[in-house]
Every structure is written in structure tokens, then in C-alpha cells.
Regions:
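Secondary-structure boundary/capping motif
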Residues: 9, 77-80, 105-107, 137, ...
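Catalytic donor-sugar/metal-binding loop of nucleotide-sugar-dependent glycosyltransferases
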Residues: 64-65, 87-89, 98-116
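Generic structural signal for secondary-structure transition and capping sites
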Residues: 26, 86-89, 106, 140, ...
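Basic/Trp-rich segment in TM-proximal cytosolic loops or flexible interdomain/linker regions
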Residues: 132-146
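Short beta-strand-to-loop acidic/aromatic patch adjacent to the donor-nucleotide binding site
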Residues: 1-6
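Acceptor/aglycone-binding surface of glycosyltransferases and processive sugar-polymer synthases
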Residues: 11-91, 117-128, 132-135
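Short-chain dehydrogenase/reductase
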Residues: 94
Length: 146
């Protein structure tokens, strides 16, 4: 399980996240802030627009139909995760791992999760430069890496 350390995602939802793997339906599961009926704190409009754009761009290159590529809540079968060499940190991680997973052609599920987004006054760190880095990583790991 990968979970951002800022607790915007609820650890009590691990059973929801890993259920498709435990039931032998999935190799990888993404928690989606944009699916399902779980509670979501309403925060920044432009973050949602940026996330939607990055997810769309990633989907174009990976041929996936994710709703939330940038989620910080993911689960993997051990063999899948161990086969990935991670190069990025910060906000380049999600586009990198999504591109590398897509090339492996595993069974991917998304599950609806809750989200308690933080404000900048509460320590939120992401900014426009992180979005630019994510775009760079989408191109880098989909076009120039095996």
C-alpha cells in the first residue's frame, strides 16, 4: 500500500483499497477521489482542473481510463511493485509509476475513497511547478523509457 503521509487519505479505508487484490480480481488498485459516494472535503477548484488534465494526459499515453492518476492512495501485488524501479520523488512519482505499470499490462482497478484535502495554511505543498514536473514525467516515462 502506498499512502501519502499527510493523512488526506483515511487509513481506515485500507480494506476498500485492497479488496480487489484479496479477491484475486486486480494486480493494482488506485483509490479515486472522484469515484464513489465517500466524503470529500471541498478545496481548490484549480487543483481539480489540474488533476483532471494530468489524468487525461496520462490516460492518452497509457491507454488507461483512470479518474485519478495523481492519487496518493494505491495498492499493488508485491510482485508488481517489486518489478518497478522508482526514479522520481515528490509529484513526479505518480506519472512515473502509472506509466511503468501500464506498460506491464496488469489488471488495474479503481475504488472510490474519501478525501480530506488540506489547505495551504494547513501545510499543503503542491504548486504549479509540481504540475509542470508531472507533465514532464508523463512524457518522459511514456515516450522515452521502456
Amino acid at each position: 500500500i502506498i499512502q501519502d503521509a499527510d493523512l488526506e487519505y483515511n487509513p481506515k479505508e485500507y480494506p476498500i483499497l485492497i479488496k480487489p487484490i484479496l479477491e484475486h480480481n486486480a494486480d493494482v488498485v488506485y483509490g479515486s477521489r472522484f469515484q464513489g459516494g465517500n466524503p470529500h472535503r471541498v478545496v481548490y477548484f484549480w487543483h481539480m482542473i489540474g488533476n483532471s488534465f494530468l489524468t487525461l494526459l496520462s490516460n492518452i499515453f497509457t491507454d488507461l481510463n483512470l479518474t485519478d492518476m495523481e492519487t496518493g492512495y494505491k495498492a499493488f501485488k508485491t510482485n508488481v511493485f517489486k518489478s518497478i524501479i522508482i526514479e522520481e520523488n515528490r509529484f513526479g512519482f505518480e506519472p512515473e509509476i502509472t506509466a511503468k505499470i501500464a506498460k506491464m499490462k496488469p489488471i488495474i482497478f479503481e475504488v472510490g475513497i474519501s478525501y480530506n484535502g488540506r489547505l495551504y495554511s494547513q501545510g499543503k505543498k503542491i504548486g504549479w511547478k509540481d504540475g509542470v514536473r508531472a507533465i514532464f514525467c508523463i512524457f518522459k516515462y511514456n515516450l522515452f523509457r521502456k
